[in-house]
């Protein structure tokens, strides 16, 4: 269920931004992830990480309202041009894949125990960026917190720590930053769009054999 809620939040944020900036959804998705991370980080610097989480939810609600208003004014033309794109379909497929693939996932890699899983649990426990908490049990305090902040948003929406959520968040975040490559794809050239989509899923494995 958390995956569906995160998907709705990310798509609402990206959809509102796409119609506001008159850009295709796949071009705005990376900005949506950056906004989710950036807002939480800004609040987290002052020790208000929960407030940052709720601020992001407020932005999602505001973006959803903007999306509805813009669609009422622009009609189905804007919907087809900016939102119902091949890139949006790829992102939707990625969320479905993340939902199904990590249902029984458990942390087992050494770096998951030494950092990725541990830092998220500390972030949830202290409700703060762990690098600034003396009592936090983390090894690498100098790691940038962006990935963990996106996983924190995901985990907060799920209502509790789930070992599959950090992997879901990380992989969705990676794909979101690759997705602008889909901006030139069109439904009438579905073969080209399919090849590009497959390439985007394969690309992370070229640099990390443990991807996915």
Predicted feature residues:
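Transmembrane alpha-helix segments characteristic
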Residues: 37, 93, 190-202
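Specific aromatic-rich, kink-prone transmembrane helix
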Residues: 10, 14-16, 197-201, 205
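Active-site lumenal/periplasmic loops and adjacent helix-entry segments of GT-C-fold
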Residues: 99-192, 196, 208-210
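Low-complexity, intrinsically disordered, cysteine-poor segments enriched in small/polar
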Residues: 71-85, 149, 156
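Membrane-interface catalytic loops of GT-C/OST-like multi-pass glycosylation enzymes that act
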Residues: 45-55, 107-110, 207-212
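Hydrophobic alpha-helical transmembrane segments
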Residues: 4, 30, 89, 193-194
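Membrane-embedded, hydrophobic transmembrane alpha-helices
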Residues: 1-80
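Internal/C-terminal transmembrane anchor helices
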Residues: 82-102
């Amino acid at each position: 269920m958390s995956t569906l809620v995160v998907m709705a939040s990310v798509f609402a944020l990206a959809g509102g931004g796409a119609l506001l900036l008159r850009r295709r959804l796949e071009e705005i998705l990376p900005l949506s992830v950056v906004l989710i991370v950036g807002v939480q980080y800004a609040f987290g610097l002052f020790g208000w990480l929960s407030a940052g989480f709720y601020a992001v939810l407020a932005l999602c609600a505001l973006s959803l309202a903007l999306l509805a208003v813009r669609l009422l004014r622009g009609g189905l033309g804007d919907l087809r041009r900016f939102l119902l794109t091949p890139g949006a379909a790829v992102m939707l497929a990625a969320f479905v894949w993340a939902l199904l693939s990590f249902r029984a996932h458990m942390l087992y890699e050494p770096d998951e125990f030494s950092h990725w899983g541990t830092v998220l649990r500390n972030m949830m426990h202290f409700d703060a960026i762990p690098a600034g908490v003396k009592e936090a049990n983390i090894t690498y305090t100098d790691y940038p917190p962006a990935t963990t902040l996106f996983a924190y948003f995901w985990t907060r929406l799920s209502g509790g720590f789930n070992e599959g959520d950090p992997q879901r968040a990380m992989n969705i975040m990676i794909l979101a930053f690759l997705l602008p490559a889909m901006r030139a794809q069109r439904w009438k050239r579905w073969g080209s769009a399919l090849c590009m989509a497959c390439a985007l899923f394969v690309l992370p494995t070229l640099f990390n054999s443990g991807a996915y």
